[in-house]
Amino acid sequence: MCPQTSGREKAFLKKLPLATYRDIVSQLAELGCKEINLQGSGEPLLNRNINEYIKYAFDKGIDCNIVSNGFNLDETMSEKLVQAGLKNIRVSVIGYNTTQYAHWMSKDAFSTVYRQVHRFMQISKSSYTTISSYHLILDNDRIEHEIVEYRENWIDPLGIDAEIWQMHNWGGQYDTPYERDKKEKRSCGRPFAPYLNVRAGGIDGKHAAVVPCCYVLGQDSKAVLGHLEDQSIEEVWNSVEYNALRQAHKEERFDDIDYCKNCDQLYDAPDSLVWSNIKGKAYGQHKIDKSFDFRDFIKND
């Protein structure tokens, strides 16, 4: 459904084996990790036993969040997610009415997803699990109009926590309908942050490839820093590849990194968050942890 799906590489369109996942989560627990996101490089609810993944992490003291298009959020799946201890599901809804949604999400499912989100809100009420929604501005000349449409057609009637953003360019792979202020180019901070991005697939037939960030989606093979299928987290974190990426960011040699050189995350764009009713939500924060800003980890020394 997502317009980004067509650009994904076949080697990365896999399901992460549960045994491999458990090994990774066990390492994370030993390292003191408290929270993970489980969407990786695809739609998490295509994995019909995603609840087993969530429950394993929950039992290790690690909260799980997912980002989903919500199309597979049926009643059974909703109950399984809540019972497993999911912390938050963020539903991606691109398009403020049935017509726009069908165009941008490539499926006429606006009403279906709306009903399923409403039901999930009832099922998860008074539980540990929360739900929110994420939306994009489609025409930058009509920002205020689109905010009103999203609110009237989705956010306000559901009473859901939501955020509306301008589009980003997926590591330079797509043209966006607006230009960021390009006066100050700087590191995004991600190579230095206590943050690990693991894909389900990998190169050479492997699973659990580590890549620098979510924005390399569609060009992951260029950005592999190691594989947790046959390496430990510590080995990948301290690898030659990871340290070379950090050094390039320290020296601001972004043009030397093919998957970084045209990425719009190298520029500040505080106006890209155009509206939110989430308390304390601000530009630069992590999707879930509002205390976590990647720019705080930028190192130029």
Give the role of each language-model region:
Residues 149-175, 286-301:
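Short, compositionally biased leader-like segments
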Residues 193-217:
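Active-site and channel-lining beta-strand-loop segments
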Residues 40, 191-193, 223, 232:
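A conserved catalytic-core signature of glycosyltransferases
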